[in-house]
Amino acid sequence: MLFRHLVLIISTLMVANTAWSANLPPREKFKRPDSIPAPLSNPLTLEKATLGKTLFFDQRLSRSGGMACATCHSPDQRWSDGRTLPLQAESVSNARRTPTVLNSAWLSALMWDGRATTLEEQAVLPITTAHEMNFDLASLVSRLQRIEGYRPLFTQAFGDDSISQQRITQALASFQRTLVSNIAPFDRWVAGDEQAISESAKRGFAVFNDKNKANCVACHSSWRFTDDSFHDIGLPSKDLGRGAKVPSQVTLMQHAFKTPSLRDLSIDGPYMHDGSIRGLKTVIKHYKSEAIQRESLSKDMQKFELSNLEESDLIAFIQSLDGGALKIQAPMMPE
């Protein structure tokens, strides 16, 4: 009798396991790429990336000389700043959380509202924004031209020591393209290592992809877990996001923001474009039932129910996307 009971339990577990496994998409959809993309107008080279790294960490790119790109995009904070709102942005209307620059080589739209389409274009924005680095590019070029130590770096990167706005942005973009997430346990599982992630994470992957459950994959797709598109997810914010950059009649873009990647998230946030949510449980709670209902709300924002186990499994899966901090030592500053 005991034997038959054990057989029944094992059979039930096998059927359940087969059921959720059958719903999984092919792992290949989430396989990491083998190379880093770069535009033909700015081929990726070690020399340009090395120059870009120095510029990225140099506080002299700001008017005050006290803020670098790395101030808000720190290696110690998953290439963000760990803050709800950026430094000096507390008084800014509709301030937005600092996004990570990890895996930005693959982005087709940058900034939360997609106002930049290339890393080269984006590199200008924080330098010239008043509540960020608050500089002008002509003055920056003049400042760097007076720093003798930069001349050999520009020569190695571009063939001569001429310093220009274009070369500065190309170098910064090149360095950012080299910032790629470390291999995560999920990546090893995708590659065939069945022991790389827990059974809980595997079940969470099923919940993540199940249209009748969380259906996170509707927006968080591809190996970076983003569709690179814009969605209104029903946050109580007056910020129009992408809607302020397109004609007002484009209703779906009102309150819409770029889908962030789920790779290498910090343990407790802050999350969302405005840093308004901390903790993955609170994020799940929002998606389950707390989105503000309005005309622009994404069609993928459908209420759903999860058991406590399914929530825990979903969080375990998201945590399996963490490859650990991409540590880079700050370079010596040229004089």
UniProtKB/Swiss-Prot annotation:
GO MF entry, a single one: heme binding
Natural source organism: Methylophilus methylotrophus (Bacterium W3A1)
Name assigned to this protein: Methylamine utilization protein MauG
Gene label: mauG
Gene Ontology cellular component annotations, sorted alphabetically: periplasmic space
Localization, UniProt: Periplasm
Record: residues binding heme c 1: C69, C72, H73, H273
Transmembrane portions of the chain: none
Biological processes, Gene Ontology terms: methylamine metabolic process
Top-level division of the source organism's lineage: Bacteria
Pathway where it operates: One-carbon metabolism; methylamine degradation
Post-translational modification: Binds 2 heme c groups covalently per subunit.
Residues binding heme c 2: C216, C219, H220
E.C. no: 1.-.-.-
Gene3D superfamilies per record: Cytochrome c-like domain (1.10.760.10)
Signal sequence coordinates: 1-18
Keyword vocabulary terms for this entry: Electron transport, Heme, Iron, Metal-binding, Oxidoreductase, Periplasm, Signal, Transport
Purpose: Involved in methylamine metabolism. Essential for the maturation of the beta subunit of MADH, presumably via a step in the biosynthesis of tryptophan tryptophylquinone (TTQ), the cofactor of MADH.
Pfam families membership: CCP_MauG
InterPro entries registered for this protein in UniProt: Cyt_c-like_dom, Cyt_c-like_dom_sf, Cytochrome_c_Peroxidase/MauG, Di-haem_cyt_c_peroxidsae, MauG/Cytc_peroxidase, Methylamine_utilis_MauG
